[in-house]
Structure formats: C-alpha cells, structure tokens
Amino acid sequence: MRNTASDNGLTLTVYAGTTGVQLAWDAEEGLREDLLGFAIKRYGGTHPEGAWLQGGIGFPAQHHPPGEFLDTHLAPIQAFRWGDYTVRPDTDYRYELVPMYAPADALRPGATASTTLRTEKLDVAPHSIAFNRAVAASQAYSRRFGEADPHENAAARAWLARGLDDFIDAFIARAGGDSALDIVIYEYELERIRQALLAAAARGASVRIVYHAASGDEQTATNAANIAADGWPQDAVRPRVTSNICHDKTIVFSRVANGERRPEAVLTGSTNWTFNGLYYQANVGHVVDDGDVARRYLALFEQLFAGATPSDMRAWLADNDPVPSGAAVDEPLQLLFSPRPDRSDLDYYVSLIGGATRSLIFATAFDLDDAVLSALAGEGGARRILRYGLQNSASRVTGYNRELARNFTATGRLRSAPDEFLQEHTPGQRGGILMHAKVILLDFDTARPMLISGSANYSVDSSENNDENTLVIRGDARVADIYLAELFRLFDHYRFRYNWSHPAAAGEEGGGTEARRAVLDDTPAWTDRYYADANDPHAIERRQLSRPLTAAPA
C-alpha cells in the first residue's frame, strides 16, 4: 500500500509492506534554514497514543549508553528517507513528519505533514511473502540477547526468524489425507521442517522428495543420512545426481483425487533448510497460490523424480519451458527454470534490468555474472536512474558513484564499534554468509514495478549447471512494496556498517564522525547535498521517492 500527502511545504510518501514501512519525503527550499533534520511520530498499533521513531546517532553534545536508541524528536533524521521495522501486518498506522530546527540543544518543531496506511496482510493469494529478520550482528540483537547463541536460546531464534519458520510450517500444514507435497531441496537438514513433513505424512499426505546428491559432496552425505534417519520409503525419495548443485528449495502442494495430483500452490524462495538459512542469513519465503504456476513446478519435479540428468533437463526446459520471448515478455507472472543449454535466462535478466526507467534495488549473495553486474551498475551508457545494491561480499562496483546515481554496499558488522554502540557478533554461525536472498526490484517507485526473485544467483553456474527457479512479477505494487521495505532494511543496516569499516567506499555518502563516534551535524549544512545540485543522486532521491508515479513509466 502506498499513500502520499502534502502539507506545509512537505510531501510525505509511505510504502507499506507487512513487517516494514519505507517513508520518503521532500521539503520546499524555504524550509531549509536552520533545519537539523526530521522527527517522525507513529500512531496506531501497540501505541495508539503515538510513539517517536528512533535512531542510533545523536548530536556531538549528546551522549547515551551503548546500544540505546534515541527518539527522533531529540536526535532527528538527517536524510529524506527512513524505515520503520516495528510494525505489524494488517494494521492501521498514521505517520507524522516533523521538521526540527536549531539549536541542537533545544530543537524547535516546525509545521507537519501526515498520512495514513494499513500494512499488508501476510497471506493474500496469489502471493504470500515472509522475510526473516536475520541480523544477529545488530544493535537490537546485542541489546536484547548479548552474545547468546540462538542454537541455545528460543527467544533469539524467534526474533531472528520473525515468523519465516512459521510461514514454512503453515504451508506444509496444508497437507493431509487428500493432498500431496512434492519437494526439491538442496539442504535437507533443519529438524523443524523435517518434523513438519513427517507430520504431514502421518496425516495421510503423499510426500515425495528430490534431494541434492553429488559425488564426494559433504552436503549429499548429510542429506542422505537425514533422509534415512527420517525413515522415508525408498519409492518416495530420489537423489538428484549432479556434478553441480540442485539448488531449489521448493514444495508443490496438490490436491489428490482418484490418484491424480491437482497442483494448487508452490512454496519457493531463497531459504535453505538449515539453521543458517532460517536464522542467520537474510532470506525470503514466497508462496504462489496459482494452479497454473504450481503445475509447471510439478512438471519440473516429475522430470527430476524420474531421474532426468542435467543434460536431459537442459533439453527438456528448452523444449517445454523456454525463456520468455515475444508477447510472453509482458506477462504479469513468469517462471524461469534452469539448467539451460545457454545463458538465455541471464541475457533476459540483463534486458529487464536495462529496461528500468526510474529505480532499482537488489540484494544478492554470491558473485554475479559480469553482464548482470554491469547492467545493475548502470555501466555502458545505461539510463541514469537511482540504483541501490547490497551484496554479501564487496565487488568491483561496491561504493558510492555520483555520476551513475549508484549506491552499492556489502555486508559487515561492527567488530570495532563506534563509541556508544555495542559490539556485534554472529554467535554460533557457520561461515560468513549474511545476505542470501537473490532479489532484483526494478522501477519500485512506479505503478508497474518488476520483481525478480528465487533461488538463482544470476551466475553462469546458476544458469547452465544448477537446478534453479526464479519468479518474475510485473505490476504488483503490493508484492513490490513488501520486498522494497525489506530490501531497504537490509541495505541501510549493512551500508552503515560497511561504510564505518570502509570509509573510502562511502565517498559523499559518509556520515559525520567525531573521533570514534558517529554523530549528526549540528548545522543545516547536511542538507546541501540534497539541494545544491539538482542532478546529485541525493537530490533525485529526495524528489523522486516522495512522489512515486501513479501510472506506468514511459
């Protein structure tokens, strides 16, 4: 849901997801004098009387205990975009934007603008979407749980999962005696999900599993051991023998009548069935309640269950599920599967990215195909649009680029935290993957956004060698806004941490510092980059995101 309101020289737009709201605003030039930032007050939910949104950075003269957050009417937001990630789904809220004026030690509020919204429901056919929180390396986790290992702390697990575990369980719980679950899974590990599948089988559901299997592969040994331990009959399971990765994480739900499966829905996304995947790594679960979509996933499953080799699958997909072309390019929902005999799916993604007219934001886990990375980065004479990106590890395009209106960052944590911040840890995590979703969102501030999301890492291996699946969804603002709120949550969280550790990458994006402190500017000079040059990306962001297009982009 999106709403825009203008009053007293202010324009405020809210983009509502399920568990997050993104706010963007603009202020007329005449409001800049002595402007030290903005406060935001939210009404509704658990605080009908109103509560100030908070931040972690104050003015130089303000000191606070490490990890304590500050109300924005005391330490205002020195930006024209902010996120609220304390909302609940399907709930009414009102946001009030308040300019705050000098002096810093006795801030004066200006005239306000406000707007209302209702956050999106979690379960609305055809698309139900859940992101985990997955930021163990955060001030909020450190403040709540210290260095507690979530393996041993149920409250920490619940906070990190933020309902993604329940979301997966609820999909499996649909299955009973008149239904079936057909699964393709890379990592058959997490006890919670395994028990949910066994419970479905005990209720009478027909359960079949295709699992990743590669010679000499540690994951294969783990999968096979868990399959055996769970007692699945041999005719219900198939190893997906491959020299690469069976990287899908899909469950097809079907009704069964007269022994025939009638597919109704599919659960897909980026979430591996591991402790890391559910609790430490940023991931998404996405349910599509659509019989036609589920039928295509089931057809793919049947090929794998019948023992098709990777070569067989390349040929079968080329003949039966080609990359969209012609009139199919404009369909509101597209599916792309791999392995492909060529890089046609990657080239298709490059063409979609190149067609964006106003904005893009992405989050990816591993090294991207260079043509995909170049398209996301706006290289090669591409249209100048707002570009935001988060990669698990830094790449050649990481950092702030004014010329290309590009702000790309990588994950990080505050091992050497600023003063007044707590140290951050990832207790109990295996490996260093923090960002695991594979999402590209195009023209998100228009009436025709486009989402690309699934299991594929947009690499040559994911295209030509791995078993993967990807959704392309056009023109669904609800879906886009749910993803947008979470992408900006993760982008802003990690950008601050990466820039603190890599100040050269921040460029003009670098915030104020005072020795080992991150501080606000106690003068209105912070506004210069938003107003001095109309072509500066900060100025474009201020004008553009506060005024989303209500018609499809040209």
Residues of each region from the PLM?
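PLD/PLD-like phosphodiesterase catalytic module centered on the HKD motif
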Residues: 1-157, 165, 169, 177-179, ...
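Glycine-rich phosphate-binding "P-loop"
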Residues: 133-163, 318-343
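Interdomain helical connector at the RecA1-RecA2 junction of SF1/SF2 helicase-like NTPases
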Residues: 297-301
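Structured alpha-helical segments in the cores of large, soluble enzyme domains
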Residues: 160-171, 342-350
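Beta-propeller domains
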Residues: 318-389
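Structural motif
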Residues: 184-187, 212-214, 362-367
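Extended, charge-rich helix/loop segments that form flexible
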Residues: 305-320
